[in-house]
Regions:
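Rossmann-like NAD(P)(H) cofactor-binding subdomain of soluble oxidoreductases
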Residues: 1-55, 59
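Hydrophobic alpha-helical segments typical of transmembrane helices
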Residues: 2, 24-27, 68, 109, ...
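Glycine-rich beta-strand-to-loop/alpha-helix junction loops that act as flexible
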Residues: 21, 96-97, 155
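Internal alpha-helical scaffold of NAD(P)-dependent oxidoreductase catalytic cores
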Residues: 27-36, 52-90, 101-140, 186
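Short pre-catalytic strand/loop immediately N-terminal to key active-site residues, enriched for Gly-Thr
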Residues: 38, 87-93, 145-150
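Glycine/serine-rich anion-binding loops at beta->alpha junctions
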Residues: 41-46, 92-102
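NAD(P)-dependent Rossmann-like dehydrogenase/reductase catalytic/cofactor-binding core
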Residues: 128-192
Length: 192
């Protein structure tokens, strides 16, 4: 396995940063006794420097090592530190798996556009740019997502009609809660 080969490289002052999904600090510590370990969960937008990584250190990590880990992880985007490792399953479900949810939104928006009569290539471009632009607006704006949504919604307008469907009791929120719960449950299963 990988642990013996990593263990051979560790010594005093060595910092191990793990991005192995589902591998807890306890698992890592068992294979690397005494090592300073940071468990991290990045996401795929890290590939363009726009990811978010959530990290949790073990007790052996000192302040200088935490700063080094932060600098390393920050090269791929934002970094959030947590003290409670039990949150990592929910983190994995929200930000680790989250890009797939956004990509699925673009896919389904595109298909809905085709169903509404748009040519496939136009629907795909409109969906891609709408999702990308909205994400960038959310990123740059000081306003939260709810306020941005409200700002684009005219009373009794077209957006309001669509949101009535998406925000119904069986709409997007309960669906997303079930999806995130399923991903968190699977993360716990993978951890053993």
């Amino acid at each position: 396995g990988v642990m013996p080969s990593v263990a051979a490289l560790t010594g005093a002052g060595t910092l191990v940063v793990s991005i192995m999904a589902g591998k807890t600090l306890g698992f890592l510590e068992a294979g690397l006794p005494g090592a300073a370990i940071v468990r991290a969960m990045p996401n795929t937008p890290a590939a363009i420097g726009r990811g978010i990584t959530v990290a949790v250190p073990n007790a052996a990590v000192n302040a200088e090592q935490k700063q080094r880990a932060h600098a390393l992880l920050a090269a791929s985007g934002a970094v959030e530190w947590i003290a409670d490792e039990s949150l990592m399953d929910a983190v994995t479900a929200v930000s680790g798996s989250g890009p797939a949810y956004v990509f699925l939104l673009a896919e389904t928006l595109s298909r809905a556009g085709v169903a509404a009569g748009l040519p496939e290539d136009l629907a795909a471009r409109l969906a891609r740019e709408t999702v990308a632009g909205s994400g960038e607006l959310l990123h740059r704006s000081p306003l939260d997502a709810a306020t941005l949504r409200q700002n684009v919604t005219s009373p009794a307008g077209t957006t309001a009609a669509a949101l009535d469907v998406l925000m119904a009791s069986d709409g997007l929120e309960p669906l997303m809660r079930r999806a995130v719960a399923a991903a968190a449950r699977r993360s716990r299963e993978l951890a053993g």
